[in-house]
Amino acid sequence: RIAATQGTALNQEIKETLKPKYADKVNIYDSIGPSGKVVITITAKAANKGEALKVSCDHLGISLAEVISFGDAENDVAMFEITGSAVAMGQADEIVKAAAKTVTGKNTEDGVAMAIDRILKTGSP
């Protein structure tokens, strides 16, 4: 995994340069780094949250259809595509929200707790 923080405009320029050349070999997307800043993340094509979740669920004997995934960055989309339900956080980019089945509040507004509360009350996020 390679991550770099350069600033939003430069990040966009870097992604636009790299994606056409390397999209078949690596994943290139924005994510939130430990500092809370947006970083460009580059990973091997097979290294994604969806693949990691498949392995974890298989090991635990849990069906992916029973899993609800939460995310706010493009690196969560692979996970959204394989789980029974996918919830985007309110601060997520539009591409992430479009990939989710529903959108909850922002992480600063206890969005995960809001979704869990809805699940407990209605059976659906």
Regions found by a protein language model. Give the residues of each.
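Conserved acidic, metal-coordinating active-site core of Asp-based
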Residues: 1-70, 74
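Mg2+-dependent phosphoryl-transfer enzymes with acidic/Ser/Thr/Gly-rich catalytic loops
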Residues: 43-125
